[in-house]
Amino acid sequence: MQSVPTIHVWDLEPIIQSEGHASFPIANREITFELKNSHERMYAAKCLLKVRHPQSDVDSLLFKRFVKQGDRVLDAGANIGYTALTFLLRGAVKVVALEPVPYIFERLNALASNDLITVEKALSAEEGQTEIVLSQSHNQGSSIKPELMEIFPEVYGAELKKALINTTTVDRLVDEHGQFDVWKLDIEGAEIDALRGASNTLLSSPPRLIFAELYADALVTFYQLVSATHPYMYRALIDVKSYQLHLCDPTLQELEPFYQTSPMYVFSQEEIKD
């Protein structure tokens, strides 16, 4: 029997409508995607068809493997709410989702309910206000960290657009919402600041797992700050041949067997057998 060819979401990109909206049910509510944004077109294609999108599937496979029934999750950098809903779909009973950019938060907040608490703030080392530089290429990537603009100048444009946003800390969120079993930190370079605002929580009630997207030298500093509670660190990658999730040595240099996706790392209190 002839095998059915694997379809990746980029195979469909030329024929996916690039304007208008598409809505799909996830975790007992409806999320709407704006098709002008490439990553939202990819989400829509995933919801409609059984297609592969390694960039977002790293998250999906991590959540499927590690989120337990009854987990309470901190989703920092929640964007429009796709990852927050995926956490709920995988068994989380409560997700506290942070998104500081006002026009994106409006969309996230439309999904709010008893099990999805939305917060219009950015994680940082302290409570207050700061400037965020807005992404001009799509609605992902806005950052409060100048070093990220050096890594991805095409995202922010020649003339930077800024907005004043509110900040909070992990310690404050735990005081307000209780402890979390899982943290997801995808906050465009502010992950170290987030840990510095989590010092009390890491001592008293650390999460079982931390998922964090980390660039450049941030990985070393991040690990130094969590190693006392989360001594096991892994790079999450998807194998090209099997499309299975692998948790690899973070120093791995030979990445050819894997899809090239954003550097997502897993920090665990206990050793994980791949």
Annotate each PLM feature.
Residues 1-112, 154-161, 175, 239-274:
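S-adenosyl-L-methionine
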Residues 44-45, 130, 141-147, 274:
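Short, charged, solvent-exposed linker or helix-capping segments at domain edges/interfaces
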Residues 48-72, 129-131, 146-205, 217-221:
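Short internal loop-to-helix segment that lines adenine-nucleotide cofactor pockets
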Residues 78-82, 102, 125, 187-189, ...:
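Short, glycine/acidic-enriched loop or turn micro-motifs at the edges of active sites
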Residues 94-97, 172-274:
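Conserved acidic-Pro-Pro-aromatic motif
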Residues 105-141:
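Core alpha/beta nucleotide-donor-binding catalytic domains of modification enzymes
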Residues 118, 132, 144, 233, ...:
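Generic preference for hydrophobic
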Residues 129-134, 143-145, 223, 246-248:
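Short aromatic-enriched loop/helix-cap "lid" or pocket-rim segments at secondary-structure transitions
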